[in-house]
Amino acid sequence: MTAMILDGRALAKTLREELRADIQAFVQTTGVTPSLAVVKIAGDPASERYTRTIRKGCEDIGIVFYDHTLPPDTTQAALEETLHALSFDRAVNGILLHLPLPPGFDSNRAIAQIDPHKDVDGVHPYNAGLLAMGQPTMVPNTPAGGMELLLRNHILIKGQRATVVGRSVVVGKPMALLLLQEHATVTIAHSRTKDLASVVREADIVVAATGKPGLITADMVRPGAVVVDFGVNVLGDGKVVGDVDFAGVAEIASAITPVPGGTGPVTNIMLLRNVLRAARLQGVGRGE
């Protein structure tokens, strides 16, 4: 068996065109162009690269982009003040705080300053609570992208056994809740799970989100399983790989996401889609 490749780049292209049309319709109806404010602390090259990617994506589909880069010596209070001000700024529809923050900063306190209706990363406790209650509004972008890949490729989820390996609040846990909402029977595994291989082997859908390259190997995956790999790991030679041994698992899985080119491209589109969703939630437009 050779797995079907769940191509994130191709899907992202389709989603981008759909979102572009939705934004144009929103602008025509409301007279408002959706906007995103990115808040970050200077000094992290990876954060700078990500900002450029998001800026380009916004400009491509018609979202106004604001860059709020704070100096490396900024304080917790200054960061919170910036987020608080943006939350009350009617010209800003979405707020994205680059995480993780540098050592010494309290990310929970910072996130709490973001208006939940502007929380396009889906990290505010209010939005996490809605997701847990089965009322998702602003969903974290990475798991939302993974679900989009499954649903758009007509992968059967209802009644299937799904194992999510990883329990982070931004990927593992929300992905488990999204699968549960689609009526899968979900198990969450993690670093302290006994006999991880046997737990994974029971799954019809395997989700890897651990940050450990090659953790999921072919002998751990049942034939015909669907595998979603959220891992992004840079090896010593510069090669980017996932948490799944792609070459081996692709021989026995029925479908698999590659790394790179799988969940990543869709994740960025989910962020931009949340900006439009935020604008709608805020009821912006004519007649305010």
UniProtKB/Swiss-Prot annotation:
Pfam families: THF_DHG_CYH (PF00763), THF_DHG_CYH_C (PF02882). Catalyzes the oxidation of 5,10-methylenetetrahydrofolate to 5,10-methenyltetrahydrofolate and then the hydrolysis of 5,10-methenyltetrahydrofolate to 10-formyltetrahydrofolate. One of its GO terms (biological process) is methionine biosynthetic process. Pathway: One-carbon metabolism; tetrahydrofolate interconversion. It comes from the Bacteria. It catalyses: (6R)-5,10-methylene-5,6,7,8-tetrahydrofolate + NADP(+) = (6R)-5,10-methenyltetrahydrofolate + NADPH; (6R)-5,10-methenyltetrahydrofolate + H2O = (6R)-10-formyltetrahydrofolate + H(+). Keywords: Amino-acid biosynthesis, Histidine biosynthesis, Hydrolase, Methionine biosynthesis, Multifunctional enzyme, NADP, One-carbon metabolism, Oxidoreductase, Purine biosynthesis. NADP(+) binds at G166, R167, S168, S191, V232. The keyword NAD does not apply. Belongs to the tetrahydrofolate dehydrogenase/cyclohydrolase family. GO terms for molecular function: methenyltetrahydrofolate cyclohydrolase activity; methylenetetrahydrofolate dehydrogenase (NADP+) activity. GO terms for cellular component: cytosol. Homodimer. This is Bifunctional protein FolD. Its EC number is 1.5.1.5, 3.5.4.9. The gene is folD.
